[in-house]
Amino acid sequence: MFTAALSSGLLLPRSAPPLSATPIRMLTEEAALTPAPGESLRVEPLVDEGALVAQGQPLLRLRASPQIVLTAPMAGRLARIELAPGRRLVQAVIFHEGEARHEYPAPAAGPEGLRALMQGAGLWRLLRSRPFGQMPRVGETPAAILVMAADTSPGAPDPMQELRGREDDFGRGMAALASLTGALFLCGAEGLPAPPDTRRIACGRLHPQGLAGMQIHRHCPARIEAPVWDIHAGDVADLGALLVGGLLPETRLVQVSGAALRETRLVRCQPGADLRGLCRDIVKPGPHALLSGSALDGGPAQFLAPRDRQVTVRPLASGPARRHWFAAALRRAGRPLPVIPTAALDQALAGLPAAALVRALGAGDDESAIRLGALSLVEQDLALADYATAAEPPLSAQLRAILDRIEAAEVPA
């Protein structure tokens, strides 16, 4: 039984060239472990620079939580580990070499054994805990887990295509996740196996209906004392494969699109793949920017971010911007600039109380923002609203400022 889909959202214009039909396997010559956007990881190396490593082998562990490790995205040679002050990870770069794979033993029975396996095999960081949108703490217990088998972001690959032929792995992963929580939700994925108590949520084609934050706000709002996790359905299938075979899958399905390309490409590549390698031979002449993520919420990057499954290549302006006195006056005006509530803003927030939420964000009103659903959201969930309003500063940045204040005040260090 499916819960009714959200009815609000926008159908975004397509600016990418046509998609090539069949995914191609493409392991780039370089790959890297990097923090997710906004994430700060204080790490300790487990392997020396220059050493040969197997795909899936633990390379780094968190200093504060040594149970949680980061694993090699491919077999190769660990070229360098770049750390910022405080031993915060910038990137750990690997050059492709060999085909070795690291095998994990079967986990101990029960939820604690599953936690230990996910934390020790690098899958824990693919979970995202709300509020605040970070990796769950080691001992955190979620009130619910939402599995996303739908994605309406512009240029995102269809998660159902990634799951094709992996239905058994997905069902095994879903059964495992059910042991970690009292409520398991599955968004999309009609016909895929899931435990009997799973609540299925229908998802429409409009954006942002396929974002976890909007579904969490509607079906299982996050609270400080009752966190909610979300995870991509492809990562759930990876967990199922790890449980039965002891090996982490080598690739994930990634779509490479954007107006600066001659064609849209669907690839199976390693996590942390080099974006330049994924775009090779299909970039149009001229200056361009590589983004990990969608055109709405992606950021400039050299390597694919940990949770991303799309790459956007957009053209850059080739000359200086035309000057105008009115635009210059607006840039010198006070901040934040007023946001005018419109129908587009209402649709971009998919049923959230748009005017009240924007007012709370602009005023820095933490209590009102909490009451209106901010604890279920992260920056990605407001990216379409930023696009619809051209808000300055962006609504997503205002949301992050409020979340950071709440976290500092309410969550023990």
Give residue ranges: language-model regions.
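Short, well-ordered turn and helix-capping elements at secondary-structure junctions
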Residues: 35-37, 63, 260, 294
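A common structural microfeature
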Residues: 28-32, 42-44, 50, 67, ...
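Aromatic/His-enriched, Gly/Pro-containing loop or helix-boundary segments
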Residues: 41-46, 63, 103-108
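N-terminal, Lys/Arg-enriched amphipathic/low-complexity engagement segments
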Residues: 1-46
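Surface-exposed strand-loop junctions at beta-sheet edges and helix termini
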Residues: 47-48, 53-54, 59, 73, ...
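Buried, small/hydrophobic-residue-enriched core segments of structured protein domains
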Residues: 68, 82-277, 281-413
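Glycine-/proline-rich flexible loop or hinge segments
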Residues: 55-63, 98-101
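Generic structural motif
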Residues: 37-41, 53-56, 65-80
